[in-house]
Amino acid sequence: MALLAQQLPRRFNSVKLTSFIKAKQVTKRSARAGKAVLPGFSAQPLLSSDTSFLRRGIKTYRTLFWNRFHSASTNRTKSSAESTLLPSVAEQQERILSLESELPLEEVDDLPPLSPLQSVSEEEAIQIAAYSPLPISSFTLADYVDHSKTLQKLVQLGVDLSKIEKHPDAANLLLRLDFEKHIKQILLFLKDLGLEDNQLGPFLTKNYAIFSEDLENLKTRVAYLQSKNFSKTDIARMVKNAPFLLSFSVERLDNRLGFFQKELELNVKKTRDLVVRLPRLLTGSLEPVKENMKVYHLELGFKHNEIQHMVIKIPKMLTANKRKLTEIFDYVHNVMNIPHHIIVKFPQLFNTRVFKIKERHLFLAYLGRAQYDPAKPNYVSLDKFVSFPDKIFCKEIAKASLNDFEKFLKTL
């Protein structure tokens, strides 16, 4: 027994714990250095997993210690066990395993320094498990992906973490969430709404805050839309094109629908069709809408019923850039001499780039074909004028080749 007691400290001191001790020292230094790091997002929710990495390291090296001690002492014990009162190999193993389980994490600091030249067998090297330290603070979620199953599953869904990490609050939110408890139920809810698998990633990249919403509140908002006779297909389309729609309360959604119905003097069906085609009318600011309504009426001279007709056909006119609207109207009305009543029939003019309208009109004027009055021969439809690609425009309307059109553009 005395012989074993003398051998045990020497064997224990020879265990190669260098890597583990270094890992623990690095962890301590990281904790101190974290105070000096610029404000990013913290990994506090994941620190418990870091501790488990540390304990697995202890277990690995304890196992190596036992393997070494067992192989070195077995031969000696066989020759002396019969003539002495030393315990058997099985008893030694039981005691060593007991020692392994009783070694606390705090006693690692008290271990004596080990020689860096001490060799490790190939079998022991294979058993060494290396775990990268978890950063205390970081400016990128990429540092936490290997440690977080939640982030890994979000990446698999197609979520762009590089966009979310620009918002520290959102990044911290994701680090605190558990996929099974908090995220899975939201994904199933979105799937029930009609979103496809390839649509979940882009949706969650834009509206990551939906994970902080109460599921019952989300269901209540969907039920409200259904009560307004929005079909399941309509709701899926609206949620896809306006990801923040479900983050709006029922009261706010009701106020927005009421605003457009009153402002444009639309019936319920036309109001519903309007927001289905452009659902961001319900989520965006109302100031551009109010401003454009004034521009159409006061600056461009359209009547209320004319504005209503154009907006129903091209909902984007409500949120278009004011400067673009005035430039297009000025050129179409004052240069091309197209009156209001014809513009009202072709509101897609306001959804076209100004330079495209100029190029095509000048080319038709050069050829003597710039005739936009439907009551006269050789009439050019403004719908085809703006919608046809260059090749078809040249063939069907200008009656010229694409090469001639490209040469003409070089003269402008």
From Swiss-Prot:
In the UniProt record, the transit peptide is located at 1-67
Q: What is its main location?
A: mitochondrion
Record's keyword annotation contains Disulfide bond: no
One Gene Ontology cellular component term attached to this UniProt record is: mitochondrion
Output the SMART domains linked to this UniProt entry: Mterf
Alphabetized UniProt keyword annotations: DNA-binding, Mitochondrion, Ribosome biogenesis, Transcription, Transcription regulation, Transit peptide
Phenotype caused by lack of the gene? Embryonic lethality, due to severe mitochondrial dysfunction. Embryos are much smaller than normal and none survive past 10.5 dpc.
Where's it found, cell-wise? Answer: Mitochondrion
Q: What processes in GO biological process is this protein linked to?
A: negative regulation of DNA-templated transcription; ribosome biogenesis
Task: Spell out the InterPro entries in the cross-references.
Answer: MTERF (IPR003690), MTERF_sf (IPR038538)
Single GO term (MF): transcription cis-regulatory region binding
Homology family: Belongs to the mTERF family.
Q: What does this protein do?
A: Binds promoter DNA and regulates initiation of transcription. Required for normal mitochondrial transcription and translation, and for normal assembly of mitochondrial respiratory complexes. Required for normal mitochondrial function. Maintains 16S rRNA levels and functions in mitochondrial ribosome assembly by regulating the biogenesis of the 39S ribosomal subunit.
- Relay the domain remarks: Contains seven structural repeats of about 35 residues, where each repeat contains three helices. The repeats form a superhelical structure with a solenoid shape.
Recorded protein name is Transcription termination factor 3, mitochondrial
Name of the gene: Mterf3
